[in-house]
Amino acid sequence: MRVEKGTLHIRDGLTHYPQEREDYRFFKGDLDLPPRIVTVDCSGGLSFDVLAWLAEQGVTLICLDWKGDGVSVLACNGYAADPVKVRWQQETRADSAARLAFAADLIGRKIAISLTTLEQHIPPSRLQTIAIEKSRIGIDRLANEKFADLNAVFAIEGECASAYFAAWQGLAISWKGTKRHPVPDGWQIYKGRSSLANGVKPENRNASHPVNALLNYAYAVTLQRLQIQAIADGYDPTLGVMHSGKRGNPAFILDLIEPERPRIDALILAFVAKHTFSGADFVIRDNGGCRLSPQLAKHVAAIIDGRPQRS
């Protein structure tokens, strides 16, 4: 990023291979001048000329780390977010009826996309039929019922999610080279979304099955992308409408990712259906949880980003 002949010249960094680097040039007073510029995981330095140019044109510079968390903000008014958008977040969350309507619509869209994933990526079975029926009922209830609180919305979501992942049970995973890289017997088929590495209480985190590890990683990649985009768009990532969170947690990003989850599921299901894995693709940790190898993680990130991978 530098000033050349009175213009701001920005050149993309290298994030993956192969990649064509793009150049951007902005003129003072340009109608297309962005209100904020976001850099992600950058190194190097900025000249005082660049800082002065940004300040003069009222452009906010936001520096994020690779996770999408803020590192620094350079803003003329000391505030990086868009006041109008943040006010909408605050007012929608504070208004009980508006918050419920937001949540019902969000979860309704999530279940509708889940229905498509069930129909297109899960083989016909009794459990698939049950999940499809529950999804249709859930969509109808969310569109037509009046809810007293968020717990009623979450109850519908939970019932549909339970049936949704139950329909995945029995999905086969293909393996190669198991003599050289043996895998646990429990990895031959998919049994459920909960992790055995979490003890008595079933939870989705700390995956103990490869499919769940793939899902968790894909969700994390998407969460990072959504957080960066939300910040670039001027929202406060910590101010959730449906979700609440501890200070600093990206509650609004947890809102945004809800309808994206079943889309991610579809991508992972399609990948699992056509890919033959090796035991070397996963690392088993001391507590029984499994993690993706760096090479597989790179491949999954490319799938989520819609980038073709070289074989």
What are these regions (language model features)?
Residues 1-13, 56, 81-311:
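Active-site helix-to-loop segments that bind/position phosphate- or nucleotide-bearing substrates
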Residues 20-27, 43-46, 54, 145-147, ...:
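Short, exposed beta-strand "edge-strand" segments with a Pro/Gly-rich flavor and a Y/T-containing core
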